[in-house]
């Protein structure tokens, strides 16, 4: 009787173990996020300020290739919730399942963070990914999942619909502005010793970029023009020299279509050096005019006359 009871218990245990294995085995497989053979839904978001090429991935989020005006390209993942654990993820380029199988190309390890922006790649990696996608290869990124029930999470970036939108993305890149607001919001142009009558090619190029940006961004409505000098010469003469430099830059901007009423012109002489006046290099950095841009939402009412006297307020 005891022997029969033990046999029944062994059968029950084996049955339960079998049920556990059947239930747990799928959970131990890698979780793959992909559009599969469905339309990839690639889309291009275009403006003169930024170009983005995006693919939404069901249950994951998006893979985004982005280039801002004046900057190098990049790529990042945008997920709805954390899907990957932190650590080095593997990235490969592979042939889609519907094409003759070829050996996958190892694109190296990429640093993954846990969170909703787990991955950011610089220009070199982003352009490499775009090149493989354009050639018809998928990109697969794999790393341990952040939750224990799945040993690995994989993201497959598909090529379906890619080439058409990639062409639109390239067209957008051709129309980007030469620089963005963050790059130009505080610009300095420099002068030769004692000079306040000549803007060299580099100075004109910087100012022209500002003009081009402003023509496409109506929110930029305030310009603070601050003139400076080094300490060579008389203090009073330097104050006048900084005024002439600030006025020269202001007149150039006005000649390019910037409304004069949007300019706040100030001059400070040698009061606010950007570098030490004890060296030639330092003095060359102090002979400058800075142009600071402000957007409408960030601007404060200006209660001072446009040609405010030097030294009343330090340049911001």
Cite the ranges covered by each PLM segment.
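Bacterial N-terminal signal peptides that target proteins for export
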Residues: 3-16
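N-terminal signal peptide c-region/cleavage motif recognized by signal peptidases
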Residues: 24-25
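N-terminal targeting leaders that direct proteins to extracytoplasmic destinations
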Residues: 30-180
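Second-shell loop/turn segments in exported
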Residues: 116-120, 192-200, 235-239
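Extracytoplasmic/secreted proteins, especially bacterial periplasmic and envelope-associated proteins
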Residues: 128, 202-209, 240, 244, ...
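Periplasmic peptidoglycan-binding/tethering modules of Gram-negative envelope proteins
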Residues: 138-221, 295-316
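Periplasmic OmpA-like peptidoglycan-binding domain that tethers envelope proteins to the cell wall
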Residues: 229-316
């Amino acid at each position: 009787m005891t022997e029969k009871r033990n046999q029944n218990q062994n059968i029950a245990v084996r049955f339960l173990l079998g049920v556990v294995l059947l239930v747990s085995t799928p959970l131990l497989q890698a979780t793959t996020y992909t559009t599969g053979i469905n339309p990839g839904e690639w889309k291009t978001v275009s403006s003169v300020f930024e170009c983005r090429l995006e693919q939404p991935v069901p249950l994951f989020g998006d893979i985004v290739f982005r280039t801002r005006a004046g900057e190098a390209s990049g790529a990042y993942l945008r997920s709805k919730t954390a899907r990957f654990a932190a650590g080095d993820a593997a990235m490969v380029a592979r042939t889609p399942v519907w094409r003759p199988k070829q050996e996958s190309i190892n694109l190296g390890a990429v640093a993954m963070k846990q969170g909703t922006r787990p991955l950011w790649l610089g220009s070199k990696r982003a352009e490499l990914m775009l090149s493989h996608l354009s050639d018809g290869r998928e990109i697969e990124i794999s790393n341990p999942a952040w939750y224990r029930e799945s040993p690995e999470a994989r993201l497959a970036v598909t090529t379906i619909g890619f080439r058409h939108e990639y062409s639109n993305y390239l067209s957008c890149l051709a129309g980007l502005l030469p620089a963005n607001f963050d790059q130009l919001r505080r610009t300095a142009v420099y002068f030769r010793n004692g000079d306040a009558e000549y803007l060299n090619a580099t100075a004109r190029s910087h100012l022209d970029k500002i003009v081009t940006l402003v023509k496409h961004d109506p929110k930029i409505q305030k310009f603070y023009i601050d003139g400076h000098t080094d300490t060579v010469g008389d203090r009073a003469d330097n104050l006048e020299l900084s005024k002439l430099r600030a006025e020269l830059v202001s007149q150039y901007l006005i000649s390019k279509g910037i409304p004069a009423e949007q300019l706040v012109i100030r001059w400070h002489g040698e009061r606010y050096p950007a570098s030490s006046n004890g060296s030639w290099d330092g003095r060359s950095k102090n002979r400058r005019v800075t142009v600071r841009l402000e957007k409408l939402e960030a601007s404060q009412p200006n209660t001072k006359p446009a040609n405010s006297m030097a030294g009343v307020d330090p340049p911001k």
